[in-house]
Amino acid sequence: VRTGARDESIELSGVSHFLEHMCFKGTPTRSAEDVNRELDEMGSQSNAFTSQEQTVYFCSVLPEHQLSALNLLSDIMRPTLRQSDFDTEKQVILEEIAKYDDQPPYGGHDAALVKHFKSHPLGNSVLGTAESVSALTQPQMLEYFHRQYSANNLTLAVAGKIDFVKIVEQLEAECGDWNNHDVQRDTQRYSTTPDTANITNIHKNGTHQQYIIQITDGPSATDADRSAGQLMATIFGDDNNSRLFWDLIDTGKAEYAVLESQEYQGSGIFLGYLCCPPESQESLLQRYCQLTTKLHENGVTQQELDTAQAKVCSHIVLRS
């Protein structure tokens, strides 16, 4: 479903992720127990996740179960959203938020996105906040569902040993009467002016490590240089066999040091993440800056580029 945290208002922060949970709580023809039982009977590997821009429901089954799995996934796209289920699941979401805030980097990722994007919707938290989720009502979720879960806003992807003709026939029979309208999304590019004072400190008692997150503008999902950005991030900051890995991780100076390229519709970022002992923070940040300066001035070697291309291509194939 082409909907996520960036499609939410401040008042509805967290509703996309909350709705993802609710889609497994029953439909007009299935109870929550039926949904889980049928997934288990098919021997499926299934799950769901919500991001800034999409909510994904997926299911891997043997070929003989493909139509049954399609029927089930289509059905949960039309949940009942009962008040009783809403009230129960709200407590689950609040516990998830508390757990997220109590583990590394202790809300630092969301805080960094808010600091970078400011009022832009890409700074919205996927989970929402305890305050926004607590205040959310079932009618608000119902209105959001009818607005965002339009047939025109859903994409079905099927791969493997499939019967394409039967899948299309079943979709037309089961989903042909779904409400269909255009869903709007503001994809205006966001760019920020570098600000050395743009820093937020979060203090957490009892921690033994320092978690540092840095964000700067990067290519969007449709920019011509998005692949170059991804390859550069892989060379410089992949979690294995990158410049940061050999300089900071393999030497034992830092516990974790990566650079990621994250592309969205209309905007993008490079996100750097460093985890180290507090007493090493200043020296490691200086070294991090030295490495980025070297990358900027000297570029990359052909061997680094070849390795990164092989790694990225392998990830694309294996991920699918």
Question: What residues fall within each predicted segment?
Answer:
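Short, compositionally biased low-complexity segments
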Residues: 11, 66, 201-208
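Charge-rich, well-structured scaffold segments of protease-associated domains
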Residues: 32-185, 190-193, 201, 219-220, ...
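Acidic, glycine-rich loop-and-beta core segments that form the ion-binding/anion-interacting portion
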Residues: 170, 192-195, 207-216
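Short beta-strand-initiation
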Residues: 196-197, 243
